[in-house]
């Protein structure tokens, strides 16, 4: 083969690879502020891009209401990492496919500051409690904990769980409902009660993501703990591992959304 033919073949091969690659938007539920979300999860999207040959682009939402409304439109989020109730919602109503989940389970904790002198959740009726807005799992747990509309705390709605905690530390809220894993980072917080555990967050894919790309992402996630690149990614995002899962794991959790505006 002459040099000209080799060069032509090389560029044709590159063009073929470029034609096969695609860009997919990856969003994470806005539990953290957008800048912290990027810092926390860019190692994951970079890893998936390297492993799949596609451009997995991290996008963020400023708050849960914006996230919820954008998600329901079904046109902007190709890949989503979020909680059990919204994962099940998309599986049931939007034909998403669950690819893998973070290992373990997760709960929420109702916390106060160390000087609040609160011993039971009912003592927060009529008092200020900070939480991300509906339909975050935290807010749904608050509503579940205080079902009587006449005997509820005064909700201080915030954009993310860090803001919830800061409201308590700054004395602008008596309590807050936050993911239990965050509580350990703040020794000033006192846990009043912890909710039932649910399956941990999962990554699900829109019907726009081809089956072969879904499989490539799934394989990259569940095998991450077995490779140096995957182990580095897991350490960077502070996840123990990803594990295989199915729709059955999340079946029924969408019922937590009943009564939510827009459900």
Where do the PLM segments sit?
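Bacterial N-terminal signal peptides that target proteins for export
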Residues: 1-10
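Periplasmic-binding protein-like
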Residues: 22-31, 37, 104-112, 181-225, ...
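Extracytoplasmic small-molecule ligand-binding "clamshell" domains
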Residues: 22-86
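N-terminal signal peptide c-region/cleavage motif recognized by signal peptidases
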Residues: 15-18
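Bilobed "Venus flytrap"/periplasmic-binding protein-like clamshell domains
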Residues: 22, 26, 31-47, 107-166, ...
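Acidic, polar ligand-binding/catalytic clefts
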Residues: 61, 65-123
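A ligand-binding cleft/hinge motif common to bilobed small-molecule-binding domains
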Residues: 81-93, 165-197
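General small-molecule cofactor/ligand-binding pocket signal
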Residues: 57-59, 156, 192-193
């Amino acid at each position: 083969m002459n040099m000209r033919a080799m060069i032509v073949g090389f560029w044709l091969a590159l063009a073929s690879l470029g034609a096969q690659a695609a860009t997919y938007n990856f969003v994470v539920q806005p539990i953290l502020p957008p800048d912290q979300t990027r810092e926390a999860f860019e190692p994951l999207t970079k890893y998936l891009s390297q492993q799949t040959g596609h451009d997995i682009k991290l996008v963020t939402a400023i708050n849960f209401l914006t996230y919820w409304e954008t998600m329901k439109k079904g046109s902007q989020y190709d890949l989503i990492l979020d909680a059990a109730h919204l994962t099940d919602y998309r599986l049931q109503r939007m034909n998403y496919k669950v690819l893998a989940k973070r290992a373990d389970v997760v709960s929420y904790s109702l916390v106060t500051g160390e000087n609040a002198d609160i011993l039971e959740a009912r003592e927060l009726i009529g008092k200020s409690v900070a939480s991300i807005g509906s339909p975050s799992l935290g807010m749904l747990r608050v509503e579940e904990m205080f079902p009587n509309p006449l005997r509820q705390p005064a909700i201080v709605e915030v954009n993310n769980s860090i803001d919830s905690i800061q409201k308590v530390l700054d004395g602008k809220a008596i309590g807050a409902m936050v993911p239990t894993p965050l509580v350990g980072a703040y020794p000033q917080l006192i846990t009043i009660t912890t909710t039932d555990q649910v399956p941990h967050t999962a990554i699900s894919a829109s019907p726009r993501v081809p089956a072969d790309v879904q499989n490539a992402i799934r394989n990259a996630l569940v095998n991450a703990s077995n490779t140096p690149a995957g182990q580095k990614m897991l350490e960077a995002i502070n996840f123990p591992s990803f594990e295989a899962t199915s729709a059955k794991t999340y079946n029924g959790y969408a019922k937590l959304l009943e009564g939510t505006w827009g459900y």
